[in-house]
Amino acid sequence: MILDVLRTFSTRTRNLPSSGFYSISTSIMRDIKVKSDSKEFLTSSDEEEESVSIRVSSSSSLSSVKSTPEIEKKYVHRVYDAIAPHFSSTRFAKWPKVAAFLESLPSGSVILDAGCGNGKYLGLNPSCFFIGCDISHPLIKICSDKGQEVLVADAVNLPYREEFGDAAISIAVLHHLSTENRRKKAIEELVRVVKPGGFVLITVWAAEQEDTSLLTKWTPLSAKYVEEWVGPGSPMNSPRVRNNPFFSLESIPETEVSTKEQKVENSQFIGLESIPESEESTREQKGESIIPETKASIVEQKDEKSVEESLEALKKSQQEYFVPWHLPYHRAEVSGASASALASGLAKKDDRKGAVVYNRYYHVFSEGELERLASGVGNAMIVDRFFDKSNWCIVLQKEALNQD
């Protein structure tokens, strides 16, 4: 069943009729080994190893794939695996602008959904061929049970050959990637797998939430970050930083582990001081770009109004959060995955709300940030940008081949 059609997919290019603004045509996918008659899926399981490289070589200009940070494995991958049935039951409404994008694509288009979740957009345009992937095995199982063409894969390492799809979408995915390099890499992957002239739609949570009260329900990651991921030997854990009430976290330093060092043995958390520094992140790991002197000097200001204004500015600069997911006690999975999560400390009980509470990691995007990342992708251009339902959204078009 799953992906059988892809193993024998013709390399012939189809001439498709144009229907609307997004006029595209199909390409090809490289071979993928997936057992269609069993429960096995293509996987990059972090339980087995840090990452599984399944992509073919591509342009040297692409950002290098980093080792999956511990924060993503624990507070994204494991959380969504645990809450998958409940999460899926709450995800059925389709965003009108995403639907409009998909419906504008011509008949016969191959559409790749990177981070498809429960597959609510797969098959939205019945005249197109959809393939979804997600890092969560349970969510992919939900899609597979509905007969959708899906596989387990990482957004920063998509398992498709170059120029395979006619279009790609990434809906509410990039904000779960914890470093700028990984977010940029995910964009590069989306562009890589669509053919020249193809389109990519990306949506991310915005720092500028329409309902600002939501921010009060989220946990800023600064204190948690220092406590669990930085480690005692880092300048980030100095008394000046630790006791600074104005400390905010705009980004998480990049971690880079060589393929020979991808295993972190018996470690619950990665201490950044023990990981080789990448060139881009040296200053961040030393705390220089995360806590500029202008922030530290706020505590020395005498004028109370100035301090309040500075504090408000710092709150606005906060972009790293834990966002709670409340899983009701009556849900069946509470006795399964959630029991294990409670025992391991991944989740906590909230008897007042009658729920098991998980924290999901989010990097919320400030205005212009998504465009800045996308503009660094050399072979694509931004053709549309908009703000929708507290999300920043862009449409990219991959450069068409020169017609000589």
Swiss-Prot record:
The gene is TRM9. It catalyses: 5-(carboxymethyl)uridine(34) in tRNA + S-adenosyl-L-methionine = 5-(2-methoxy-2-oxoethyl)uridine(34) in tRNA + S-adenosyl-L-homocysteine. Coiled coil: none annotated. This is tRNA (carboxymethyluridine(34)-5-O)-methyltransferase. The lineage of its organism: Eukaryota, Viridiplantae, Streptophyta, Embryophyta, Tracheophyta. Interacts with TRM112A and TRM112B. It holds the Pfam family Methyltransf_11. GO terms for molecular function: S-adenosylmethionine-dependent methyltransferase activity; tRNA (5-carboxymethyluridine(34)-5-O)-methyltransferase activity; tRNA methyltransferase activity. It comes from Arabidopsis thaliana. Catalyzes the methylation of 5-carboxymethyl uridine to 5-methylcarboxymethyl uridine at the wobble position of the anticodon loop in tRNA via its methyltransferase domain. Catalyzes the last step in the formation of 5-methylcarboxymethyl uridine at the wobble position of the anticodon loop in target tRNA. GO terms for cellular component: nucleus. The keyword Methyltransferase applies. The modification Phosphoserine is found at S238. Its EC number is 2.1.1.229. The keyword Phosphoprotein applies. One of its GO terms (biological process) is methylation. Keywords: Methyltransferase, Phosphoprotein, S-adenosyl-L-methionine, Transferase. InterPro entries: AlkB_tRNA_MeTrf/Diox, Methyltransf_11, SAM-dependent_MTases_sf.
